[in-house]
């Protein structure tokens, strides 16, 4: 299971939200590009989210994303970018900046045809984010909850050359209380795509538990890493167990 650090961008800074709430923000680094360069020393892939873009529905932090991609990709690192990608033009712009993968969440619910089209044109470079609140997929920067489930999204994309599904339990994101192992296991067993797990990781034991779930190919970590619950080296070892 691949360990993938997250950099969430807000106002040009690296931050984390608590349970997806924009009124509960912790700033971890005022220079996201420098942070990305440090992470590249140990990690092959980075997960970057334009939080303002996720709310606005279009890229907002493009300059900060560009700097992060340049810093992390300077020595061959791969960056996946999400937040506000709801059009082909937005997707293409990030790929042109050097993103290895693009992450689409709201578009997967509201415009699955767009996701299928992009996956077909860029096979293996589209990640679909399914961010769940009480079992339903949240959209528009997690501020609205749709009527569909994570498995509904997966079924709508069956057969598309999607790289992975990124599953987040929003109620656990930024809490370090532990990931939703049951929901992650059920999705991985049923969706037909590799699953990236996210939300709630707070210990090495959480990473080891996720690593034992068949079909989970990666895990996104943020707050626990930046607040010292474990070192990057320890996390990579636990994820590989």
From Swiss-Prot:
The keyword Iron appears for this protein: no
Top-rank EC class of the record's enzyme: isomerase
Alphabetized UniProt keyword annotations: Amino-acid biosynthesis, Cytoplasm, Histidine biosynthesis, Isomerase
Protein name (Swiss-Prot/TrEMBL): 1-(5-phosphoribosyl)-5-[(5-phosphoribosylamino)methylideneamino] imidazole-4-carboxamide isomerase
Gene: hisA
GO cellular component terms, A-Z: cytoplasm
Its EC number(s): 5.3.1.16
Enzyme active site: 8 (proton acceptor), 131 (proton donor)
InterPro entries per record: Aldolase_TIM, His_biosynth, HisA_bact_arch, Isoase_HisA-like, Isoase_HisA-like_bact, RibuloseP-bd_barrel
Record localization: Cytoplasm
